Amino acid sequence: MEARDVLKRPVITEKSSEAMAEDKYTFDVDTRANKTQVKIAVEEIFDVKVANVNIINYKPKKKRMGRYQGYTNKRRKAIVTLKEGSIDLFN
């Protein structure tokens, strides 16, 4: 899997913005990507050193629209911790 295929988008929320002060950055990643692939992708794309990767899986939620029901997409979120002395990604 290519590095650009692993990372989908950065997650910008109040909680993730506060974590950026501690060099922790949050990304939506491909559901098939593992921690090693996420680490390699972040290091390759942003030219930084990664210390740790934590991954959270979100199950699809039930949704209804009138009489039709379905599910939202499942997603996978990665929290990437950078090593000391790395450059800020979004600042």
UniProtKB/Swiss-Prot annotation:
Single Gene Ontology MF annotation: structural constituent of ribosome
InterPro entries tied to this protein: Nucleotide-bd_a/b_plait_sf, Ribosomal_uL23-like, Ribosomal_uL23/eL15/eS24_sf
Sorted UniProt keywords: Ribonucleoprotein, Ribosomal protein, RNA-binding, rRNA-binding
Keyword hit for RNA-binding: yes
Biological process (GO), any one: translation
UniProt-listed SUPFAM superfamilies: Ribosomal proteins S24e, L23 and L15e (SSF54189)
Pfam families, alphabetized: Ribosomal_L23
Entry's Gene Ontology cellular component terms: ribonucleoprotein complex; ribosome
Family per similarity comment: Belongs to the universal ribosomal protein uL23 family.
HAMAP family: Ribosomal_uL23_B
Record's function text: One of the early assembly proteins it binds 23S rRNA. One of the proteins that surrounds the polypeptide exit tunnel on the outside of the ribosome. Forms the main docking site for trigger factor binding to the ribosome.
Assembly, per entry: Part of the 50S ribosomal subunit. Contacts protein L29, and trigger factor when it is bound to the ribosome.
Protein name: Large ribosomal subunit protein uL23
Protein species of origin: Staphylococcus haemolyticus (strain JCSC1435)
Gene name in the database record: rplW
